């Protein structure tokens, strides 16, 4: 016996494209219906502020590295002065007083602490540069899959914002893999009992009235369960 019903077709795999950063959209490289390959350019966001951030981070790192270099030189000099004071003290205790030796030790400890602090600043500056470059990279959005652009929700000139609180708020476009589609249909209750998982189905689409697609029943959900 044949069961006939109508329903809605959706892609089994559909990826919503959103931005992790805020910025004005300067280029939308595709249109709805375009086929794309994984890695293809979809959207470009104004990168000027993020390029400036990278330049500042690079300058901070260069300054931190220069300071660290000087701090290491000062530490090494203080270490040599302390070693020389200790050597003279061993040669003749009268050549270096306790106060002078203590002063040399203190100067070395201070120089060593400053060198460690400078190295920490270098580490922090490198992390800042990595983050700035990561933010810059996010101004270019590429397709994560092979598929087709099934929705474009924005226009050039609009501001992209992260969808922090709502997926719909940050949605820019949708790319779908239409090689596998699923059909959700509402079947009359009297016909549900005649359906079984794995049953073969023939599907016709309004857009292609002369073509019949073959599928299989993957799930049967009673109406009461759908309303939960």
Sequence positions of predicted segments:
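Generic detector of contiguous secondary-structure segments
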Residues: 56-74, 128-151, 194-206
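Alpha-helical hairpins and coiled-coil heptad-repeat segments
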Residues: 62-116
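Elongated periplasmic alpha-helical coiled-coil
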Residues: 20, 51, 84, 117-159, ...
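Beta-strand/loop subdomains of soluble extracytoplasmic proteins
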Residues: 146, 150-154, 158, 168-171, ...
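A structural signal for short beta-strand/turn segments enriched in small hydrophobics and glycine
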Residues: 7, 25, 33-42, 85, ...
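Long, amphipathic coiled-coil "stalk"/hairpin helices in large membrane-associated assemblies
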Residues: 2-63, 91-96, 152-155, 187-191, ...
């Amino acid at each position: 016996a044949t069961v006939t019903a109508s329903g809605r077709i959706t892609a089994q795999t559909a990826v919503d494209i959103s931005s992790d950063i805020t910025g004005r959209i300067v280029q939308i490289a595709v249109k709805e219906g375009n086929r794309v390959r994984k890695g293809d350019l979809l959207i470009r966001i104004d990168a000027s502020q993020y390029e400036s951030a990278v330049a500042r981070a690079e300058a901070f790192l260069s300054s931190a590295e220069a300071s660290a270099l000087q701090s290491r030189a000062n530490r090494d000099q203080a270490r040599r002065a302390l070693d020389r004071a200790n050597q003279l003290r061993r040669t003749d205790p009268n050549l270096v007083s306790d106060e002078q030796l203590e002063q040399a030790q203190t100067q070395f400890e201070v120089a060593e602490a400053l060198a460690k602090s400078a190295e920490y600043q270098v580490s922090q500056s490198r992390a800042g540069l990595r983050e700035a470059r990561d933010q810059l990279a996010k101004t270019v959005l590429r397709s994560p899959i092979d598929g087709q652009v099934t929705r474009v929700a924005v226009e050039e000139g609009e501001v992209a914002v992260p969808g922090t609180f709502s997926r719909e708020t940050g949605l820019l476009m949708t790319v779908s893999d239409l090689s596998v589609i699923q059909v959700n249909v509402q079947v009359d209750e009297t016909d549900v009992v005649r359906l079984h998982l794995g049953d073969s189905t023939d599907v016709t689409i309004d857009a292609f009235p002369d073509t019949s697609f073959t599928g299989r029943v993957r799930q049967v959900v009673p109406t009461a369960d759908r309303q939960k």
